[in-house]
Amino acid sequence: MTDYPFQLVNYNRGKPLEDKSVLFRRPFTQHSTSFAEDSRLFVPGDELEIAINTAIAVGEPLLITGKPGTGKTQAAYYAAYNLGIEPVIHFQVKSDSTARDLLYHFDTVRYFHDAHLMKEGLPDKSHYLEKRALWKAMLSDIPRILLIDEIDKAPRDFPNDLLHELDKMEFFIPETQQLISAAKENRPMVFITTNSERRLPEPFLRRCVYHHIEFNEYLLERAVEKRKKEYAGLSKDFIKMAMQRFFALREKTLRKTPSTSEFLVWLRVLALRIGTLPERLDQDLSKLPYIGVLLKDHQDIEDVKRGGRF
């Protein structure tokens, strides 16, 4: 990895790059294309696994909290991979999400358009229903994992509006007068994540198993160990120093705190530059090399460089 001439764009060279073949040898960071791919490398803590197994056993949703980048979403994909029941049915909560968005969609516009064109009678309303995440999970021939991701983004009533549906695993469709329910043995396993410290309604919390993912050095070490081939050439002491710098950065008041994935990319860049780093990691945080890999906010970078706001 260290034979790659990192400084390809170089003003001091004074002329265009002569050896274009090096462009074909760029050691790209291998970003996975999906959460499912990342699940193979996800490293859960023991307490997280206990919480997952508890929620599965008692049939209650697992509510996972934690700061961004701690692996809340990945926990659901890891569980699905580990249980051999992929893919995860993923519902991404939005600021305008309603409980019904998780259940089904009725195409009212198309229904009334078709009804207007009919000379007699009315269209079959069941033809205008679209199954959404919970309905799909309930109809699966095997128990599935349903992920309700970032529930804190939803309107305040969203959690309470799902109390019956998540508790009984059934819901009513007034348009067709249908009661949809899951077979007891096929009850979906529900994972719910939240980034916010805003407290969810008490009735909702009472129906959940709860786990908070605390970002810590042990879990980061395990994540690095899983990918150790990517960091060939870096000594254990160097990696430990990099981790210390990373955690020192995370302790600062930042607009966007760097995550595990950003640390792993940063470590890969450091591995490419081993032996030629212009800066030392044991210096002040303002001198961290390649800080743009870790921080993605201009003001954060400026504050770190100035030592301000800390």
Task: Give names to the regions the model predicted.
Residues 1-310:
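C-terminal regulatory/interaction module of P-loop NTP-utilizing enzymes
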